């Protein structure tokens, strides 16, 4: 017998093309299947190999029967088609596109070859284009398989006696009808492997039969993409003659049928009808059912059967996923009639009627018979045991295109299909022994086959009637496959055959449990089975039931998704016989009621609440498919554990069952709901309420169980998780395709109405037998040790192939095969596995925590937003995410996922706003996700790279942004001693932790010669230092949805980890949220639920800036409309802007010591009080208020001494480039520039109105790699150079000058270092305004230090600012005469400082808000301003005017001129006498200093490099602003003296220190307190956020700081100040603690945090609070290092600029 190889669209790594494989079986005419004219019929791909055939026996010769001329001809045609496709493309194709075109060309050529009648037709180039067009439209290719429909019906033909049974006539051999263009994802079409007859001996089993009948070949066809396609008995129709009088069957070529013929047909049954509907495109059913049918079986005499196999795999049109990869959506359903001849082993036939059955090891199949005419919905799955699996174990994943149908199973050496007799006998004996052992089990599970017409249910344990025969098992080899006989339909036309359109249906692959459990199954009633399996088509009246055959149809489109079928155990089926009358009656009923067939609607709720078999899990099937290696042992099948599993699931069902009572089909549901209600309020550990005590114990165990091998908890958790994953995956896939057709589902209520209930048994009971521990893939951020059983090695190969959700149009026009992907997944069951049903939330990774995140193995092909599969760029909606749409009759969401009531009853804190998307409308959510995939802020190359990842999403990818791994920008590290930044990938040393961590660069480490190193005055042993490399990468954290169990990046989900309440907060992903909102199951939260920018306190300053900004924006919009000539309403405007002052605190600036030493005699102030303010601009972008702009200012008021009196310093200003709309204003500048300028002008106007006289701006861009305020800027935003930045400021000042806000603009050098014109002011450093963080104060310290070293005779610093020191002679030459003491130092300082500043003097901008006196240069605020009538720039104050009048005429204005100008007074009015701020103090620990905010952002990775991150970072910044964190001291219970957790205690409203824990409060007689006790506020209570609550928290923080100061000064042992003793106790703890904060001591960390808060706000130079001085010195050092780096960068920039100027001039 021979094997035909039909390959199409082969890809690398798949089964090679196989040529004809001859075998010496006594029939020489069968040695060659392909003749000279028909060789190509065996080759559908032009590149088919010729010498790689595989037969049953490896010793047979391999002969290539391919005609090379035909192959070359076909290759030439492929090239023509390929060139034609390329010419149609507008742009040159890349390598990937060429590969796609070549694949399309290959399939088009195949269609052309099949269509061609003659060689001339095939080669005709004039008609080539029209033929290709018709092929693309899908008519010829789609109907190619129907060419058999007009051929003679083989079902009504019998062999012609006397004719030689040869297949030598090529015209009678039909190539595989699985067409790649129809299948869409066909990787391998029908590769028929001739398995031959294992028993080649003569007689009954060998060679040709003596009666002249052909010994039927057994064809095993491998389906496309790894699926098994059509498989049946081959018989040359040339030897068949029509049988008169028989009704012709309607053949469904795309149905999943089964056809089996006996090897020896008794003469009495020669005329028996053998209808064949195992069409060539039977992707699953006929293949799997045909596989393994033993050739040595005799037909049963009985002519009537009750198990007609449905030609359309029992698929109801409403259930079939017409968008799936194997569905022809344009076709209607096709009925097919079958004649199934069941077999039983010949050595078991003893003349009496024996129930026929067969067992197939390796591949296990079983048939379920709900109805004699509905046909068998079959499911095929691996039944191999551990000893049947080689090292490359196959792992079934219960889905179409899963590992069972993957081609790798069949890429075995030829000897994999061969069995030695001794092995076969051993396996037979082992099988029987195991069957006997199983019979001893107390519970015999059987599957009852019911004909659906009220016939007697027949129990059958068919294993007792089976004797394992050759070919049954493959020990340590791949499953041996034997095919039933299949008819190769010829191309002859037959008037009796009716053609019908086909509808393909996916079949689900279900693994079968190991051999030891092969007999077990659960009882099921007929109504269940009918609901599980609703075949639409009608089988013939002559069919038998098959044992060990089960096929479940998988409907992707319906919400329930999976057909309930036994996925773990080999289900045994009885042979229920019915009469022809009943068959005909049911036939009529089915025809008339076809459209009323009830489709299965299995949801998560119905699985639990009804007596169904289990839904199919993704990965728990692996446990049985690979044997005991990854199983938890037989203990999981203990009835005790099974009952506990059932009870847990039924509890979960009752908890979420809706409505609460009365309508649930299970009578026990209401009872369990009452039990839940009782347990919610029951606190009695010995409660006598029925089931209460034991249920609470079981739930308690379930909550706390961490055992990865627990036989109760792990299966339940696995089932719950995977049910939710599949539910949401189906919902995502439903609407993700370009267009879905024929998607109609029936609600769960209709299913419940027809479902039978088992009285007294929870309906979830039947699901538990299938629950096995599943794979839980751990998502690793850094490194971790996987949690796996010590004695098990559970590494398996999960082979999954993706599904395409094609629309009708996509299926016709582009059928791109999908690559199968093999992933190595290590079985690791984490301790923190999901416990979704009873209030246990999986721990989510927080910042700073490198915790592995479990992420479920999602269903292949259901990744991401559009349910798109890998390698499907052609049908992917790249820009618009797909969304699950509510179909008519779609079950409610709470039936698929956990209801909010469940989570709240299970004590999950219902914290509102844990994700900001909860405030969004569905459209805003969609807009947000669209924005995620735009990658705004990244460079074009990176953005395109990330966008390309959408087309290859995997289960590792984020479901929102479609990218898998995203890492943060590493925060900069600075050396503690020298302040230098440690470069990326450089080595360094570190010690300590948290705020006390110190870093040492290699040079500083090497400079310290001893065994210790000095850091901030503390000596540290070098032995404790840890050497590291600055190459750490931190991955973005993930969060898991509590409903669908899907994972997203926290940033993508706008998830607030601070609200997570220890990982227990309920989180709903955007997908589930949108579904809930659109189904009216929830409403978006009010905007007030999460406080935003508008909820921040308003101040006079913020109102002033906002009002001015909005007014000017209206004017600008009007101007734009005028310029563009359009109406005002048509002009885009700026929306949703919010300006707020987030910090306004009093500070003191201490004068540096060396500078103060010079001017101490002049009574120079030792410190300058000022107010530090932070102004932020927010704009709502895609529903999120994003911080776009910020500035720090220092206000030195009228109470401050000179030279800082009434001055303002613009300390830092920063922005990010996300402003919307990104357009130009009327004057040509960017609209965002207009807005930022108006904010600055508004602030200057506000300062002028308050009485400030000047503003100082240092136009200094940030260093490369560093930031001022907002951490990590986008790549698209270039850092401006100093000249560009300076011009930006000057443009703003020119606008302000036009409005009269700015009186004069100059620079620091011209105003203070020169005496030009009539200026009479002294040039001294004492006149320079002294600002915190400015350039010159730090530079002055360096210069003074250098001068001191010169005076001491020491060598100056080589890196000094000046190469040549300035001598007194030089000063004398310049006109300076006073060289005494400090005056000399002052002059030298001004000279050196002037030389330093002069090259960049334009960057130090002095803005005069009031007029300055020409003589003394003071800014006038009172009295009169004396103005010259002729000189506009000359004006004097009252004091200088009086002095001017006393001078001689030649010294008066104008100096040295005879004509004197008239000077007249102008009264100075409207300037306040003081600059007192009427705004309240606003404290913010995070915005206290620029460095504090930057550290917050760096430590928590609040980056602004992309809009995606900027939205999340701004959300978190607003959270911190609204929730100032008051330190939480440990509260002690006054009764039991144990610590009270936050929010879990009671406090007296009168007594300050009386607190009681919950346990003591509930105990009777424990509390004897006269005052009222109130509960502690918890995180859940923070939902009701309001401004009063925020003010209260601010007040608490202030009280805490006051308490710290009080405790540090208090000496009373019995102080009555609340919590004073506790703070003192912390002080004492800090003295004796050896662990310290750096070692992780909780108390020390709290104390350290409190001390830092105090030190930042402390203004006392001599403070009694411990470590206050040290902390302030630490902060000063950090600021000094930052200023030094800034100055050094400026000097380097100036040096480069000077070099450039010198180069150009030279």
Curated annotation (Swiss-Prot):
A zinc finger (ZZ-type) spans 1408-1471, 1528-1581. Residues 1-33, 251-284, 397-456, 524-543, 791-909 are annotated as: Disordered. Residues 407-434 have a biased composition (Low complexity). Residues 397-406, 794-805 have a biased composition (Polar residues). Gene3D superfamilies: 3.30.60.90, TAZ domain, Zinc/RING finger domain, C3HC4 (zinc finger). GO terms for cellular component: nucleus. Its main location: nucleus. Pfam families: HAT_KAT11, PHD, zf-TAZ, ZZ. Its EC number is 2.3.1.48. Zn(2+) 3 binds at residues 1533, 1536, 1557, 1560. Acetyl-CoA binds at residues 1213-1215, 1232-1233, 1288. Residues 1090-1526 form the CBP/p300-type HAT domain. Zn(2+) 1 binds at residues 1413, 1416, 1437, 1440. It is found in: Nucleus. It catalyses: L-lysyl-[protein] + acetyl-CoA = N(6)-acetyl-L-lysyl-[protein] + CoA + H(+). This is Histone acetyltransferase HAC12. It comes from Arabidopsis thaliana. The gene is HAC12.
